[in-house]
A protein has these predicted regions:
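Acyl-thioester C-C bond-transforming condensing/cleaving domain
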Residues: 17-20, 30-36, 85-95, 106-231
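A glycine- and small-residue-enriched flexible loop/hinge segment at structural boundaries
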Residues: 38-89, 93, 103, 138-152
Length: 231
């Protein structure tokens, strides 16, 4: 059985856009939680959410590749860039070796809803656009990143609610340990928008501490009142 090592890591989240920013946020106790006014407009009981800045990919990817990326794919792309950079994995290595990709992703609701809205309003499926299908599939991250980074190894998406990313890392470990793969890009990414979590809000699953956004997520507190969606 092979030993398995982590050679690089990348993070793009509500508490930082890279490892250094996340480290500083952890040292300073920054939660990255805030209020999303759009959720209140949609009738949400709780507008609390992790505030994740959408990356500007215009200088990093051509329009065709950007057009196929859903929101969570953008986050995953940025994290992957950092991970490969730390691991010193360049394009030449990716082209010459069989590198796999396993990503946890639980939904891609926004592109689906946006496409359906167009069809209902315009009565014309052609107006949905060519990129919609690649954004809508639950495999949107692994499908897009495998093309962008020339990944030719194992390729599938794992969906297991909040544990999706952890499952992906565990599965990558097992595949490398058993000798079935030599190198795998793995992790998790999730969309952060009102469409994907409306049902949770309706169930009363979210914290209602809108007056204390930074202190709302307190899973081990005896006075906890719910979770906070984030990414």
């Amino acid at each position: 059985m092979k030993r398995v090592v982590i050679t690089g890591m990348g993070i793009y989240s509500c508490i930082g856009r890279n490892q250094e920013e996340v480290k500083e946020s952890l040292f300073q106790g920054k939660a990255g939680i805030g209020i999303a006014p759009a959720r209140k407009e949609m009738g949400y009981f709780s507008a609390l959410t992790g505030l994740v800045e959408r990356p500007d990919l215009k200088k990093l990817l051509d329009r065709k590749k950007r057009h196929s990326l859903a929101e969570q794919g953008e986050y995953a792309y940025m994290a992957t860039l950092e991970a490969f950079r730390q691991a010193r994995i360049e394009e030449k290595f990716l082209l010459e070796n069989e590198v796999g990709i396993l990503y946890g992703n639980d939904s891609s609701a926004a592109p689906v809803i946006q496409a359906i809205d167009i069809i209902r309003e315009k009565k014309n499926t052609a107006l949905v656009g060519s990129g919609s299908i690649f954004q809508s599939m639950n495999s949107t991250i692994t499908m897009n990143l495998s093309v962008i980074f020339h990944l030719k190894g194992i390729n599938f998406t794992i969906s297991g609610a909040c544990a999706s990313g952890s499952h992906a890392i565990g599965m990558a470990y097992l595949l490398i340990k058993s000798g079935l793969q030599d190198c795998i890009l793995c992790g998790g990414a999730q969309e952060v928008n009102p469409y994907s979590v409306g049902s949770f809000d309706g169930l009363g699953a979210f914290s209602a501490r809108e007056d204390e956004p930074e202190k709302a997520s307190r899973p081990f507190d005896k006075n906890r009142d719910g979770l906070v969606p984030s990414g």
